[in-house]
Swiss-Prot record:
This is Heat stress transcription factor A-9. It comes from Oryza sativa subsp. japonica (Rice). It is found in: Cytoplasm; Nucleus. Exhibits temperature-dependent phosphorylation. Residues 20-33 have a biased composition (Gly residues). Transcriptional regulator that specifically binds DNA of heat shock promoter elements (HSE). One of its GO terms (cellular component) is nucleus. Residues 171-246 form a coiled coil. The keyword DNA-binding applies. GO terms for biological process: cellular response to heat; regulation of transcription by RNA polymerase II. Belongs to the HSF family. Class A subfamily. The hydrophobic-rich region (HR-A/B) corresponds to the oligomerization domain. It holds the Pfam family HSF_DNA-bind.
Length: 410
């Protein structure tokens, strides 16, 4: 029998490797196989925390730029009005506590940029790059350390810098100390400003009072000038009224004196006594009669060789005699003055200059053919007045109806 030839057997081809991730490959048969559903799970992309999304939307909203907005450059955001921001927190979060909001910022790694305002920054929180929010991670607590150790664990920094607290309230202690110092400084400035304001108020009040006094004086001066312009003889009348008032202080209406002349009782008046009154002593030269009597060198006295010095009649009569007696005495003298130039300095009415108790010259009124003498002027008779005379003059003018309108207007 013939032998049968066998075809050579080729080795079985290796089975193709199963496809990774399924798709076009078939399912693995058998009990030990696994379907695509039980294969390795593809990791999902990282999600952004809702807190970061809400904060980003608040900062980017133009309607809230006066409360919170991006800082210059867009690398940080600023809370301009913390009170208004805290009031509007409940619209975006479940709370309205500004401190809790700051705590959450610290939890996500935000840091305060400016010490004097609420400005915060993070590398993944940039204007116009919202996709970077997924890079911001929330800090996680270590399972090996207890929460109390985490809150109290300080981190040593470079020499000269303060320790930074890490934990739930990390970084807030330093901020609280800064706020306390700022508050103390502001309180001191407030006290200084209040003191300065009180001082300024007192100065302004003093200036107002001085201005009111100046305005009153100006009104009085303007009223007096208006009266003088309307009535030019007002000054002459005022001077005559003053002279009459001063004479009435010494003479009664019946012509008698109210009090005696102290110079006659106490003797001659010395310069020391009259200098304190502001009066002036006028030397009087009596006439020299043609008699055989001897003239003693006693000033103001004429006597014989055997007689005692007596006061001059011209000095004794001004306050003791009436005006008419003075005129008679002057008329009876042939030569009343040794030098007639003194008499010719007056007008034609032959007025005699008299002196009052204070040795101040006065001009008594007299009649000349039924007419009064010429009015006095301020330039001719500007005499010093005592305080008592000024008070009596003011009282008289206030009771005089002629000057009532002048006082009222002034």
């Amino acid at each position: 029998m013939g032998s049968k030839k066998r075809s050579p057997q080729h080795p079985a081809a290796a089975a193709p490797p199963p496809a990774v991730g399924g798709g076009g490959g078939g399912e693995v048969s058998g009990d030990g196989g696994a379907s695509t559903a039980n294969g390795p799970v593809v990791p999902k992309p990282s999600e952004v925390a809702p807190f970061l999304t809400k904060v980003y939307d608040m900062v980017s909203d133009p309607a809230t730029d006066n409360v919170i907005s991006w800082a210059e450059g867009g690398g940080s955001f600023v809370i301009w009005d913390s009170h208004a921001f805290e009031r509007d927190l409940h619209r975006h979060f479940k709370h309205s506590n500004f401190t809790s909001f700051i705590r959450q910022l610290n939890t996500y790694g935000f840091r305060k940029v400016h010490p004097d305002r609420w400005e915060w920054a993070n590398e993944g929180f940039i204007m116009g790059q919202k996709h970077l929010l997924k890079t911001i991670k929330r800090r996680k607590k270590s399972s090996q350390e207890s929460p109390s150790e985490i809150q109290k664990a300080p981190v040593k920094t470079a020499p000269g810098t303060e320790n930074i607290e890490i934990g739930k309230y990390g970084g807030l202690e330093k901020e609280v100390e800064t706020l306390k110092r700022d508050k103390a400084l502001l309180m001191q400035q407030l006290v200084d400003l209040r003191h300065y304001q009180q001082t300024s108020n007192l100065e302004v009040q003093n200036l107002i009072e001085r201005l009111q006094v100046m305005e009153q004086n100006q009104q009085q001066m303007m009223a007096l000038l208006a009266i003088v312009v309307q009535n030019p003889s007002f000054l002459n009348q005022l001077v005559q009224q003053q002279q009459q008032q001063r004479r009435s202080n010494w003479w009664s209406p019946d012509g008698s004196k109210k009090r005696r002349f102290h110079a006659l009782e106490q003797g001659p008046v010395t310069d020391q006594e009259t200098s304190g009154r502001g009066a002036h002593i006028v030397e009087y030269l009596p006439p020299v009669p043609e008699t055989s009597g001897q003239v003693n060198p006693v000033e103001g006295a004429i006597c014989s060789a055997n007689s005692q010095p007596v006061p001059s009649p011209a000095v004794a009569t001004p306050m003791d005699m009436q005006t008419s007696n003075v005129a008679d005495t002057l008329g009876s003298s042939e030569e009343p003055f040794a030098d007639n130039s003194t008499l010719h300095e007056w007008d034609d009415n032959d007025m005699q200059l008299l002196f009052d108790d204070n040795l101040d010259p006065i001009l008594p009124p007299f009649e000349n053919d039924g007419q009064m003498g010429p009015p006095l002027s301020v330039q001719d008779y500007d005499f010093p007045q005592l305080e008592q005379d000024c008070l009596m003059e003011a009282q008289y003018n206030s009771n005089n109806p002629q000057y009532a309108d002048v006082i009222t207007e002034a």
